[in-house]
């Protein structure tokens, strides 16, 4: 756990760097289409380091996450057989993807909204939206709502309770790391066996 605590402390320091917002933009964009690390990892320490800019950071996450989601949609729509399938295979979701199609045709908008808000791998949904031909305009609108809710909720909580949350994270870092890991593995497990 010392390794993870060191990463957390390092991230808090980098969050104060003058170029931190560009890293946040890049991670937000990439995570929505192919990158495995969510932008929350950088958003949280950045908002803790500069409470006054928390809502601005949420805006960055929302905009670039939706733009990355459009790339994910394009990968699914235009390049699923040449690129998208490898991303799905990387996460071992081949079987789930075909079963998922039936649910997606009926509940696509709700699925995009849910994935936008939760820790569910959003890139899986952005690619699926393209593969299954979800209306691109609805996809963008629902992505803005879902991703905006997620990132602004985090930013608002950190704005109002930042120091308390930071103390809580510092005190229970090891437990929170384990819980986060269990949730991450659990969500991948659920996706795989839907």
Where are the regions a protein language model picked out?
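Structural signal for alpha-helical transmembrane segments and their flanking helix-loop junctions
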Residues: 44-49, 118-144, 156, 161
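Conformational gate/switch positions in structured elements
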Residues: 41, 69, 109, 134-136
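Transmembrane helix boundary and interhelical junction motifs in multipass membrane proteins
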Residues: 21, 31-45, 110, 116-128
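Membrane-interfacial helix-loop-helix
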Residues: 1-26, 49-118, 144-194
């Amino acid at each position: 756990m010392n390794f993870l605590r060191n990463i957390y402390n390092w991230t808090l320091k980098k969050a104060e760097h003058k170029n931190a917002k560009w890293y946040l933009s890049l991670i937000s964009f990439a995570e929505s289409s192919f990158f495995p690390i969510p932008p929350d990892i950088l958003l949280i320490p950045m908002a803790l380091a500069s409470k006054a800019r928390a809502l601005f950071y949420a805006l960055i996450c929302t905009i670039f996450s939706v733009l990355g989601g459009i790339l994910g949609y394009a990968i699914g729509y235009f390049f699923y057989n040449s690129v998208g399938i490898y991303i799905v295979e990387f996460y071992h979701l081949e079987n789930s993807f075909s079963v998922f199609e039936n649910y997606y045709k009926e509940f696509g908008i709700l699925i995009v909204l849910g994935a936008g808000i939760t820790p569910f791998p959003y890139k899986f949904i952005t690619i699926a939206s393209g593969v299954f031909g979800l209306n691109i305009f609805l996809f963008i609108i629902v992505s803005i709502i879902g991703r905006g809710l997620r990132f602004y909720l985090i930013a608002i909580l950190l704005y109002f309770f930042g120091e308390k949350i930071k103390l809580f994270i510092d005190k229970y870092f090891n437990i929170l790391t384990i819980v986060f890991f269990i949730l991450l593995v659990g969500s991948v497990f659920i996706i795989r066996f839907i």
